[in-house]
């Protein structure tokens, strides 16, 4: 809640107890993730527990890779991968490496930790491994061998980037996932720059000053692949948009519905055909088709400039869904009104602790976000009706 730790208040959090319960790496990552410059750390056991779960997620991903024979082949070069999915993970890994490196160099450790959290949890685990499953579970092929090597390569890059924040977990995974020449702590930073002469400059007017060493930034252009990012990014955003729409409109996961890609270009049609099985499995779709205009009674989603239509007439009870959304909207409005009444009370604002006021503002923001989603769902319902 933002209160200062005090023995007299009895609100001191013992770090040794946190380490016993959640591990040293989880506590270390928590402190790094919350250590924004110029801001106090509001420590809570829930945050430490959340980052313990993050460590567990990485451990399970490494086990999944091992169980599926993912190992880094000798001479493997991710920049020469032929599969779109593997070129995409190389592109995303290079981007994460650049962003983490820049954040660490600028002492923005919270930004670096946040980038690693999103990359590991969302990009690597939730999307890359999930999209790679059909290939891994299929028959042996060059595509499967390349995917196995790419998964192992990306995992190793993650261990290097995450090592400053979770040294014990990453060192253990480094040791057990492959035969290594040395410790992870001594490994080179990912995507190291090629050898280049360093430039030494002396500070003018001070002969005793130490020279300044200027080192080139890491070269990652060879991993950049806008085409792969465009294809996999479109796929991820489309599936995410369909899932969000399904949740907003309270459509059960067991209910399948068709997808119509409106005015699709040749490129979009090719993507849809390549990834149709994945889209049907992850978005819970029936047939995927193409049309020049959206069918009547359909919800339309705009994904990277492309229109995806989902016919919902007969799929859901429109009248019952509108009643439910109206009730949710009234509840959100009541929550906003209640918080506004408190924050509009000068006596309350003057006497309440700062953390209580912050908590009320957070409640209002949450209610506003909920209201915006409900209004969006109601607009979609109008399109269907």
Predicted regions and their residues:
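Catalytic adenosine-cofactor/nucleotide-binding cores of aminoacyl-tRNA synthetases and other
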Residues: 1-83, 178-184, 248-257, 266, ...
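Short alpha-helical scaffolding segments that buttress acidic/His motifs in well-ordered protein cores
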Residues: 26-34, 62-65, 116-120, 128, ...
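Acidic, turn-prone loop/beta-hairpin segments
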Residues: 32, 71-98, 129-240, 263
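C-terminal low-complexity, glycine/proline- and small-hydrophobic-enriched intrinsically disordered tails
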Residues: 49, 178-385
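Core structural elements
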Residues: 53-66, 86-96, 114-135, 300-305, ...
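Short amphipathic alpha-helical coiled-coil/interface segments
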Residues: 55, 93, 97, 116-121, ...
């Amino acid at each position: 809640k933002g209160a200062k730790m005090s023995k007299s208040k009895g609100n001191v959090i013992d770090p040794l107890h946190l380490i016993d319960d959640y591990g040293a790496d989880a506590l270390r990552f928590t402190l790094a993730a919350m250590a924004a410059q110029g801001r106090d750390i509001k420590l809570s056991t829930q945050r430490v527990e959340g980052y313990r779960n993050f460590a567990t997620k990485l451990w399970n991903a490494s086990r999944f890779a091992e169980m599926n024979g993912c190992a880094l082949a000798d001479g493997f070069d991710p920049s020469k991968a032929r599969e779109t999915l593997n070129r995409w993970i190389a592109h995303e890994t290079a981007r994460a490496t650049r962003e983490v490196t820049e954040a660490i160099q600028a002492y923005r450790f919270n930004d670096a930790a946040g980038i690693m959290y999103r990359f590991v949890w969302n990009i690597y685990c939730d999307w890359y491994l999930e999209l790679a499953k059909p290939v891994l579970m299929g028959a042996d092929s060059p595509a499967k061998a390349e995917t196995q090597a790419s998964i192992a390569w990306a995992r190793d890059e993650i261990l290097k980037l995450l090592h400053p924040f979770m040294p014990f977990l990453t060192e253990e995974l480094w040791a057990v996932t492959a035969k290594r020449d040395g410790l992870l702590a001594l490994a080179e930073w990912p995507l190291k720059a090629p050898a280049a002469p360093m430039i030494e400059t002396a500070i003018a007017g001070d002969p005793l000053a130490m020279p300044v060493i200027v080192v080139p930034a890491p070269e990652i252009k060879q991993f950049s692949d806008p085409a792969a990012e465009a294809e996999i990014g479109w796929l991820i955003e489309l599936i995410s948009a369909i899932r969000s729409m399904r949740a907003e409109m309270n459509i059960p996961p067991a209910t399948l519905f068709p997808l119509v890609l409106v005015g699709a270009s040749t490129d979009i049609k090719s993507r849809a055909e390549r990834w149709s099985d994945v889209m049907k499995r992850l978005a819970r779709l029936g047939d995927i088709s193409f049309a020049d205009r959206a069918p009547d009674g359909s919800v339309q989603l705009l994904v990277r400039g492309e229109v995806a239509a989902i016919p919902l007439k007969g799929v859901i009870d429109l009248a019952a869904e509108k009643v439910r959304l109206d009730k949710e909207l009234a509840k959100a409005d009541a929550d906003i009104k209640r918080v506004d009444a408190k924050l509009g009370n000068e006596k309350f604002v003057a006497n309440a602790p700062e953390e209580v006021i912050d908590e009320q503002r957070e409640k209002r923001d949450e209610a506003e976000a909920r209201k915006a989603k409900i209004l969006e769902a109601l607009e979609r319902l109008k399109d269907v009706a």
